[in-house]
Amino acid sequence: MKKITLALSAVCLLFTLNHSANALVSSPSTLNPGTNVAKLAEQAPVHWVSVAQIENSLTGRPPMAVGFDIDDTVLFSSPGFWRGKKTYSPDSDDYLKNPAFWEKMNNGWDEFSIPKEVARQLIDMHVRRGDSIYFVTGRSQTKTETVSKTLADNFHIPAANMNPVIFAGDKPGQNTKVQWLQEKNMRIFYGDSDNDITAARDCGIRGIRILRAANSTYKPLPQAGAFGEEVIVNSEY
């Protein structure tokens, strides 16, 4: 009788352990949630384009004026903005209204900015075409600036193609870039922000989105493609 009892106990223990093991295997894990083919295939309906496709779309067209935003479009300039915030207003964005910050940012701090690879490709393409290149930024204007030289040097822009940076500034309720796009008769404008795309649309020209890097200090990140605009693939760097 004792042997039978021990045998039954062993069977029960084995069943319990096996059930526990199966439960561990089959229970969903919050640490490793997994995925499926449907989720992997899901994509936002965005009009993606490459630099090569943009160049091809311009085949046969004469040289034109094209424009670029600066911050997060051609330069990853977060290091300067990060330093500005820590120096002038650690607990707020008030540093963006401080002329002392803009004097620093526009006169040397872009030496810490990283040129974006997508900008190199685009600017090289437009230089080959003989296009006139403008940079229109929302930065505040300062008495002096070295941004124009920094951009010309970083992207090897010939003097014949390069124009001085336009500091459009920032005015509440107003898209300050519109008048410059119109005045310089730009036909394409590249930018990372919604304001860049809407400025181009307000002027009836082609606005092309460049992705803002995920680690940019400029948050929140915009919804690229939200206006049905072209968005350049792999343009976050």
UniProtKB/Swiss-Prot annotation:
Superkingdom, taxonomy of origin: Bacteria
Active-site residues from the entry: 69, 71
Binding note for cofactor: Binds 1 Mg(2+) ion per subunit.
Predominant cellular place of this UniProt entry's protein: periplasm
Enzyme class, first EC level, given as a word: hydrolase
Parts of the chain that traverse the membrane: none
One Gene Ontology cellular component annotation held by this UniProt entry: outer membrane-bounded periplasmic space
Coiled-coil stretches noted in the UniProt entry, renumbered to this chain: none
Known function: Dephosphorylates several organic phosphate monoesters including monophosphate nucleotides (NMPs), coenzyme A (CoA), nicotinamide adenine dinucleotide phosphate (NADP), flavin mononucleotide (FMN) and phosphorylated 5-6 carbon sugars in vitro. Also has a phosphotransferase activity catalyzing the transfer of low-energy phosphate groups from organic phosphate monoesters to free hydroxyl groups of various organic compounds.
Protein name as annotated: Class B acid phosphatase
Annotated organism of origin: Salmonella typhi
